[in-house]
Amino acid sequence: QAYDRARNLTKETARAGFIAGIIIGAVFAMLGLVAGSLFSPNPAIQKLVTTGMIVVGILMPLQGWMWALDGILIGAGDFRYLAFTCGASALVHIAALVVLVFAIGPYLPDDLARIAALWLVMGVFLMGCRGIANGLRAKGDTWIKNAVL
């Protein structure tokens, strides 16, 4: 029974994280349309802020889902797995940043494309890898066995 409750709670928490990510992401992206002036009077900087906030807002559902699973796995005491996968995800992210800076960045047309690419790399590679790792772990039984059985 504890196993079934943990499975159900995981599913519902992940869903809630995704839905919260949609809502927060939409608000964040919309705020990005007007928030640039809070950061700088320079119109070029304002456009960079707007672009970054829109990209982050679009990626927020993935992050909400991933962070919800983080919470479940942290609550289950699955620290060693999370530490390893966070470190591995960071290495993938760093490699993607190096590729972006040296191989792709010089061919991007302007600073708006570069800021969008920078945030996309963070969202896709860092958060994406963490999401894959957390999703695979949550589907398995190891963390449940360690936590509730």
Language-model-derived ranges and their functions:
Residues Q1-L59, F102-L149:
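Short alpha-helical transmembrane segments in multi-pass integral membrane proteins
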Residues D4-F18, I72-V99, W119:
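Alpha-helical transmembrane segments of multi-pass membrane transporters/permeases
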Residues V27, W65, V92-A95:
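Residue positions within transmembrane alpha-helices of multi-pass solute transporters
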Residues V55-L69:
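Hydrophobic alpha-helical transmembrane segments of polytopic membrane proteins
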